[in-house]
Amino acid sequence: MKIKKHKFPGVYVFIDEDGSEKIATKNLVPGQKVYGERLIKFEGEEYRVWNPRRSKLGAAILNGLKHFPIKPGSTVLYLGVASGTTASHVSDIVGWEGKVFGVEFSPRVLRELVPIVEERRNIVPILGDATKPEGYRALVPKVDVIFEDVAQPTQAKILIDNAKVFLKSGGYGMISVKSRSIDVTKEPEQVFKEVEKELATYFEVVERLSLEPYEKDHALFVVRKP
C-alpha cells in the first residue's frame, strides 16, 4: 500500500495492496467520513479514497482530466452541492486557506450537509436557486472556479449567468452535463455539441471529457472566462 502525489496539487494516488490505483485527498478533518468512504493512514497522514461512482469530478480525474483549476487556497462556488460528497473532497483540496460556497435548492438535502460543515468550516452552505444568482449575490465573493452539477435543461445558461456575477476574469468553470436532463430525444453526442456551442458564446472551452463508465451519457466541460 502506498500514497503518492497526483499531478494535480491536493490530489493523491492511492496504490492498493492488489496493485489497483485509486485517487484520494488528504482528510482536512481526520477521523471524519462524509459518505462512507474508505480512510487510509499513511506515514502519519489520513487520506480519504475518492469514489468515482459517487462523484462526477472524481470520475473525470480518473478518466484523465487535463485541466483541474481547483487548487490549495482556491475559492470555489459549487452549484448543486447536495449533501456534500464531492464538495468534501474539494474542501480537502482547497484547505483552510480556501473556501467552498455550496448552493443547494433543496432544504432537506442541504440539512444533510450541516453536520459536515460544523467541522469543515471552509464549506459555506447556501440555500438558493442556481438559476437566480442574484438571490445569493450578497453571500458569495468573486471566485476562482465555479463547479456546476445541476441536472436541468438550462444548465449551460446557469453556468454563464453565475460566471457573469461571480467568476473572476481568467477564472474557470467546470460543468457536469447529463444529456438526458437536457433532451431525452437526442443522441448524447448531439446534446454535448449544442452545450459546447452555447458555452462558447461566453467562455473559451478548454476541455470536454466523457465520464463513462462511471456515469452514463455524461460529459464534463472545463471552460475559461476571458
From Swiss-Prot:
InterPro entries: Fibrillarin, Fibrillarin_CS, SAM-dependent_MTases_sf. GO terms for molecular function: histone H2AQ104 methyltransferase activity; RNA binding; rRNA methyltransferase activity. Disulfide bonds: none annotated. One of its GO terms (biological process) is box C/D sno(s)RNA 3'-end processing. S-adenosyl-L-methionine binds at residues 85-86, 104-105, 129-130, 149-152. Keywords: Methyltransferase, RNA-binding, rRNA processing, Transferase, tRNA processing. Interacts with nop5. Component of box C/D small ribonucleoprotein (sRNP) particles that contain rpl7ae, FlpA and nop5, plus a guide RNA. Belongs to the methyltransferase superfamily. Fibrillarin family. Its EC number is 2.1.1.-. This is Fibrillarin-like rRNA/tRNA 2'-O-methyltransferase. Involved in pre-rRNA and tRNA processing. Utilizes the methyl donor S-adenosyl-L-methionine to catalyze the site-specific 2'-hydroxyl methylation of ribose moieties in rRNA and tRNA. Site specificity is provided by a guide RNA that base pairs with the substrate. Methylation occurs at a characteristic distance from the sequence involved in base pairing with the guide RNA. It comes from the Archaea.
